[in-house]
Amino acid sequence: MKTLLLTLVVVTIVCLDLGNSFSCYKTPYVKSEPCAPGENLCYTKSWCDAFCSIRGKVIELGCAATCPPAEPKKDITCCSTDNCNTHP
């Protein structure tokens, strides 16, 4: 009986994968980092600034609890799997 209980505990821990948190790419370093508890979405924001014709769009990557609201002249996309917001 003890063996069965121990087996169930081990299987539960493996299935839950305790300690594994949700991660997204974040700027400014564009590296994968764990998100805060409750932040289960990754987002990508992009927009043109005064230097857009020289260096391209400004990119912001990060985690969010909800998808950031739409903003004029900003492209915003959200996704819900680990590291799904790769640099465009």
Swiss-Prot record:
Cellular component GO terms, alphabetical: extracellular region
Main location group: secreted
Keyword ATP-binding: no
Disulfide pairings: 24-42, 35-63, 48-52, 67-78, 79-84
Annotated InterPro entries: Snake_3FTx (IPR003571), Snake_toxin-like_sf (IPR045860), Snake_toxin_con_site (IPR018354), Toxin_cobra-type (IPR054131)
Family indicated by similarity: Belongs to the three-finger toxin family. Long-chain subfamily. Type II alpha-neurotoxin sub-subfamily.
Functional description taken from the UniProt entry: Binds with high affinity to muscular (alpha-1/CHRNA1) and neuronal (alpha-7/CHRNA7) nicotinic acetylcholine receptor (nAChR) and inhibits acetylcholine from binding to the receptor, thereby impairing neuromuscular and neuronal transmission.
Name of the protein in question: Long neurotoxin 31
